[in-house]
Amino acid sequence: MKSGFGEGAYFITRSVYRDQFREKLGFDPFPGTLNIEVGDPEIVERIREGAPVIQGGGGFGDVLYVKALLNGVVEGAILFPLKTHHRQGCLEFVAPVNLRKTLKLRDGDTVSLDIDTSEIQE
C-alpha cells in the first residue's frame, strides 16, 4: 500500500456519492481511501469488469465498486473512479473506519483482499 494524493477524502464526502455509498455499500465510508498497489494491472482490470456503478453528477464522474474484505477483518469496497489520477495498478479501498489506524498500516505494508464477486455482472 502507499500514500495517495489526498483527494479521496474530498470525493468520498460529496453528497452525490455519500447516499449511494450508504445504500449500495451498506456503510458510510471514512473520508479517505487506502491505496493498494497491485503488481499486475490486468488483475485490476479483471476485478473492475462488470462492477456495479455509483452514479456521479454535477461534474463528478461515475464510480465502479466491488465489495471486499481487507486482511480478513475489515469489510469495505474497492472503488474505481472513472476520472482518476492513479495509474492502472492501484486500487482504492474504502471502509467505515480509518484503516491506517485500525490496522496500524504504514506505506509499504502488504495487505490482502478477498473480493466479493456476487454483484459483478458477467
From Swiss-Prot:
Cofactors demanded by this protein: Mg(2+)
UniProt keyword terms in alphabetical order: Flavoprotein, FMN, Kinase, Magnesium, Metal-binding, Nucleotide-binding, Transferase
Pfam families: CTP-dep_RFKase (PF01982)
Cofactor binding annotation: Binds 1 Mg(2+) ion per subunit.
Pathway in which this enzyme or protein is active: Cofactor biosynthesis; FMN biosynthesis; FMN from riboflavin (CTP route): step 1/1
PANTHER family (alphabetical): RIBOFLAVIN KINASE
Record-stated family: Belongs to the archaeal riboflavin kinase family.
HAMAP family listed in its UniProt record: Riboflavin_kinase
Protein name: Riboflavin kinase
Species annotation: Methanothermobacter thermautotrophicus (strain ATCC 29096 / DSM 1053 / JCM 10044 / NBRC 100330 / Delta H)
